[in-house]
Amino acid sequence: MAVAVLLVLPFIILKLNAIFHRRGSLPAGGGREIYLAFPAPGSELEFIQAHAEVRIPDSAIEIHALINKSDTRVRFNLPPPDFSLFIKDTYCDQPFSALNPRDVRCEEHDPDWWRPGAAIDLEKCTGGNSYIHQQILKDGSDRGSLVIYVLTLMEAFETPSE
């Protein structure tokens, strides 16, 4: 058991170091808000994906992101056939379940584009690991285009004791 921990520990430390390095590059006064009408090579898409820990399909449009030191919120529109491609690269480890939009709390500091509570047909999926908690919300109100909400939270963790 101790040998397995020692073998895995360097990989965990490298991953956490990369996450803290990314988070440390954010402005001191708050988060960074980004809008992309469509994904373009060389754009800030890679920055968004790295912080949200998702892969946004090329067919996504109207991409909004708010990246803070402790969480990342992303919202984008996606054609329904591309949803299965997107969900494979998330931390969702449970099937989607219906969610009453009235049960979604909106905070006063939420950006204008973060409104899952306004959906008519909302589903959620959650997952994560020892340092990330991710929630995916799928708004299927418009059958021609899904609105996807991604909330990725940094989990509190403790340094392994010796």
Residue ranges and their predicted role:
Residues V5, V104-E162:
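An acidic-aromatic pocket/loop used at catalytic or ligand-binding sites
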Residues L9, P39-P41, Y149:
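Low-complexity, intrinsically disordered/propeptide-like segments
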Residues M1-N17:
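Hydrophobic membrane-insertion alpha-helices, especially the h-region
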Residues K15, I19-P27, I67-K69, D139-E155:
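Low-complexity, charged, repeat-rich alpha-helical/coil interaction segments
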Residues I19-F76, F83:
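Extracytoplasmic low-complexity, Pro/Thr/Ser/Ala/Gly-rich segments
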Residues R55, S59, I63-E123:
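Mature extracytoplasmic domains of secretory-pathway proteins
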